Amino acid sequence: MASSPILRTSDSPSLIPTTLEPESLPTYPWESSGKGKISPITKEYFRCRGSDLNPPIPILKDGKVVENIFDCHGADSHSLPIRHEKEFIYPILIELVNEIHSATGKPVIITSGHRCPSHNRYVDAEAKNQASKHQVGAEVTFYVAGLEHNPEVVLNSIFAFYGSTPRYASEGIEYTQFERYDKETDVSTKPWMNKEILIKLYMPHEGRNADNRHPFPYLSIQVRFDRETNMRVAYSPTDAQHFLRR
């Protein structure tokens, strides 16, 4: 289906700061499944977290409100990204959060999976965020309940996964070894990356937005390379708009 593009002004007007209020997180199936039982995390938990109950964010220019940014109507109003006529999240993201859940035995709390372009802009209207991979199902942010202040445990489970999984071991150090990303980013800790993914650690004073209102450090995983298509993964405006409207 066709939709109107999201427009931005070229002179980058400023945003009026808003106060983000803490909100309760959704209940996941494993939270009531009983001790020792692990329910798989599916793409359902990656759905857009927009809501028409969120207040508009006014944009100022020369002291005047020139625009209000509205959130989307939420996951009930649109699908996940569509690929090959099916709802799509990059499989490695689903595999990794399940691996973390299994390795730690603790709930993985996904705070932001897919973001439609409207919700992505509502979360962060800065120009640099408009190419976020959240919009194409290639990024997820999360923390692990019970390990909120021990993200290194979660990181180590990811590193161990790549080091012990045969399909990566057979392809060499491009996948099994992580290096640090030295370019400027929005985090104070240098990200980790291999050929397939890039991992960021957001400290409690970083990355707070409408999807991450909690006080904990959290991790972001971006997909860099699609092993299925053998192609680099990048944001595409066309792909970002390729979802079903309800």
Stretches found by the model and what they are:
Residues 84-88, 114-121, 190-199:
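Short linear motifs at secondary-structure transitions and domain/linker junctions
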Residues 44-105:
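Active-site acidic/histidine clusters and adjacent loop/turn architecture
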Residues 129-139, 143-246:
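Catalytic cores and adjacent binding grooves of peptidoglycan-active enzymes
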Residues 1-45, 225-246:
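N-terminal secretory targeting signals
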Residues 89, 110-113, 143-145:
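Short His-Asn-centered micro-motif
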Residues 98-125:
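Extended, low-complexity, intrinsically disordered C-terminal regulatory tails
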Residues 11-22, 88, 98-101, 108:
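An N-terminal domain-start capping segment
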Residues 93, 124-127:
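Short acidic (Asp/Glu) patches
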